[in-house]
Amino acid sequence: MFPLVPLRSPPATEEQLLHQAQRVAGHTLGELAALAGLPIPQDLKRDKGWIGVLLELWLGASAGSKPEQDFAAMGVELKTIPVDSQGKPLETTFVCVAPLTGNTGVTWETSHVRHKLKRVLWIPIEGDRAIPLAERRVGAPLLWSPDEKEDRQLCQDWEELMDMIVLGHVERITARHGEVMQLRPKAANSKALTEAIGARGEPILTLPRGFYLKKNFTGALLARHFLLKT
């Protein structure tokens, strides 16, 4: 058996990616951080993306924060997902930043959301806050693409939310809009404003928004794959 080390370059195939993800499964974040030489924070309050960075390092991800998928050559996106002891998601999952202007002619088929969700490597992580960060274990990976029903659900929510953005109602969108996907402000501070369209078609400044998958959606896909009780 080869020693467990981070991939130094992006994997060439899905099989290689999945194999590395399966080798990482069962290890704690502390073990993986030590082997990779990555300092481990006390908690995630100021380092929200730390787990993602650690897994990207181990799996040889290439994109960083660029708009293409994490494994651009294969078109695969990496998503870590904190779960409870029953394997149920503890929080919503960020997909991408929502475009608030320049949306003429954009369709679901050509949208950034669909591009990002076309092929996803889900990696569940123990998320119980009672477990110290270094002791939380990495779960078994799942390589997923939306089936017809999931694609339809995502499409309906995307169209509803984009219609509201285009018609100048972005400020009226709440986290309750959407069955499986929601639109929420995404900004570290409330001073980071971006341009959008107002109710009368005028330019306005508002908080950047992001698309997030709701827990009912990610919970169902994990349950189906891992045969969990919902």
From Swiss-Prot:
<dbReference type="InterPro" id="IPR011335">
    <property type="entry name" value="Restrct_endonuc-II-like"/>
</dbReference>
<dbReference type="InterPro" id="IPR037057">
    <property type="entry name" value="DNA_rep_MutH/T2_RE_sf"/>
</dbReference>
<keyword id="KW-0378">Hydrolase</keyword>
<protein>
    <recommendedName>
        <fullName>DNA mismatch repair protein MutH</fullName>
    </recommendedName>
</protein>
<dbReference type="GO" id="GO:0004519">
    <property type="term" value="F:endonuclease activity"/>
</dbReference>
<dbReference type="Pfam" id="PF02976">
    <property type="entry name" value="MutH"/>
</dbReference>
<dbReference type="InterPro" id="IPR011337">
    <property type="entry name" value="DNA_rep_MutH/RE_typeII_Sau3AI"/>
</dbReference>
<dbReference type="GO" id="GO:0003677">
    <property type="term" value="F:DNA binding"/>
</dbReference>
<comment type="similarity">
    <text>Belongs to the MutH family.</text>
</comment>
<keyword id="KW-0234">DNA repair</keyword>
<dbReference type="GO" id="GO:0005737">
    <property type="term" value="C:cytoplasm"/>
</dbReference>
<comment type="function">
    <text>Sequence-specific endonuclease that cleaves unmethylated GATC sequences. It is involved in DNA mismatch repair.</text>
</comment>
<keyword id="KW-0255">Endonuclease</keyword>
<keyword id="KW-0227">DNA damage</keyword>
<keyword id="KW-0963">Cytoplasm</keyword>
<dbReference type="GO" id="GO:0006304">
    <property type="term" value="P:DNA modification"/>
</dbReference>
<dbReference type="GO" id="GO:0006298">
    <property type="term" value="P:mismatch repair"/>
</dbReference>
<dbReference type="InterPro" id="IPR004230">
    <property type="entry name" value="DNA_mismatch_repair_MutH"/>
</dbReference>
<keyword id="KW-0540">Nuclease</keyword>
